[in-house]
């Protein structure tokens, strides 16, 4: 029988990681393995029974020098699992992680694209596959991992429906992570127009065989499917979200003169633009694959003031007759050209030019 009193931290970290293989998604397992490797280097071959609470606090001091709280909390997941495993085996009495709570992580504010930025992206020449994917992401709110796994078998153009059945995470096609994520997405007229254009590009492509990891993180089902979006550089479906970001999205933003952010912000843009327009929060949540509006409130939605309707005037018009007062009617704005938008963005990027223009305008009689 194994002498558990002689087991090291490395022994139990390995046991914990092994136990996770079929319990968590592959991407989570990769994260756990990465954190476990760093922890094994830190503790080395220290006996698991020799590690005390003070050692854990010293570790945190070291981690705080290099990592954000969110990442340190990911280390905690591995630590808790490792010591819990050891305690269950009787190798230790009490886990040194007992009563250790996660650190407060800073909330990362969404950074959705404004209408002016979206117009600039739309007006910039680039890979049509990538541009169509970008626009579809804004119009449907799906995850980028779901978008690059989208196939023509998932789309019913006549019924204006799209089904989210799988995602591409790292190197694996897998079923979506929650029951709500496997869903039907309504397609509006704009989305239909984009898909009809994309159909001409990939509708004739041969079906590809893929293996889809199921929700038990063990079973796999083979499928033959025609993918909607291709990487024009490889003439193959995008490998994963990181490739989409690197080969298309980042350079395309630079070309359009739009501030860089990750492709995940396209999903945020769907939520934020629709919230700002006063569209039902429940509908937004359902389209995005959430069972309620909590995630829209907490994580995805952000009020885009520059694109919001004039609600103050609308409020005044609503009560004007009540107080026997008159309110001026809203002035309809003509469509702003993409050239004008580009000019404004260029001036904003160079304050010295903006100051010069303001001086010239101010000097006019």
What do the PLM-derived regions correspond to, one by one?
Residues 69, 123, 127-128, 140, ...:
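Short, basic (Lys/Arg/His-rich) helix/loop patches that form interaction surfaces
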Residues 2-10, 14-91, 107, 236-244, ...:
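N-terminal core-binding DNA-recognition domain of tyrosine site-specific recombinases/integrases
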Residues 112, 168, 288-314:
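Catalytic-site neighborhood detector that most strongly recognizes the C-terminal catalytic loop/helix
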Residues 73, 88, 92-93, 98-150, ...:
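Basic, Lys/Arg- and aromatic-enriched nucleic-acid-binding interface segment
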Residues 154-161, 260, 279-299, 327:
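Short, polar N-cap/turn motifs at the start of nucleic acid-interacting alpha helices
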Residues 39-43, 79-87, 195-198, 252, ...:
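Hydrophobic recognition helices of helix-based DNA-binding modules
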């Amino acid at each position: 029988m194994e002498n558990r009193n002689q087991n090291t931290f490395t022994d139990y970290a390995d046991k914990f990681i092994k136990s996770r293989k079929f319990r968590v998604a592959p991407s989570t397992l990769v994260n756990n393995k990465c954190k476990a490797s760093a922890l094994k280097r830190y503790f080395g071959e220290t006996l698991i029974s020799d590690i005390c609470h003070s050692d854990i606090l010293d570790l945190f001091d070291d981690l705080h020098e290099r990592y954000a709280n969110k990442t340190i909390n990911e280390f905690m997941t591995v630590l808790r699992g490792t010591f819990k495993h050891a305690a269950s085996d009787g190798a230790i009495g009490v886990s040194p992680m007992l009563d250790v709570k996660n650190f407060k992580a800073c909330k990362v504010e969404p950074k959705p694209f404004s209408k002016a930025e979206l117009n600039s992206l739309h007006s910039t020449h680039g890979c049509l596959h990538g541009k169509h994917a970008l626009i579809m992401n804004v119009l449907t709110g799906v995850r980028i991992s779901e978008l690059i796994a989208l196939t023509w078998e998932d789309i019913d153009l006549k019924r204006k429906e799209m089904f989210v059945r799988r995602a591409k995470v790292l190197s694996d096609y897998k079923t979506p992570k929650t029951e709500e994520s496997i869903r039907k997405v309504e397609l509006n007229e704009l989305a239909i127009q984009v898909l009809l254009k994309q159909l001409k590009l990939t509708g004739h492509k041969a079906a590809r065989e893929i293996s889809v990891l199921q929700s038990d993180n063990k079973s796999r089902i083979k499928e033959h499917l025609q993918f909607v979006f291709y990487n024009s550089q490889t003439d193959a479906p995008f490998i994963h979200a990181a490739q989409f970001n690197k080969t298309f999205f980042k350079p395309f933003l630079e070309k359009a003169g739009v501030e860089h952010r990750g492709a995940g912000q396209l999903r945020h843009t769907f939520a934020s633009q629709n919230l700002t327009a006063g569209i039902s929060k429940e509908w937004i949540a359902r389209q995005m694959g959430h069972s309620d509006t909590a995630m829209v409130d907490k994580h995805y939605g952000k009020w885009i003031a520059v694109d919001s309707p004039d609600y103050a005037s609308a409020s005044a018009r609503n009560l004007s007759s009540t107080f026997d007062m008159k309110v001026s009617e809203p002035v309809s704005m003509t469509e702003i050209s993409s050239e004008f938008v580009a000019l404004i963005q260029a001036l904003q990027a160079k304050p010295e030019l903006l100051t010069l223009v303001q001086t010239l305008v101010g000097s006019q009689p």
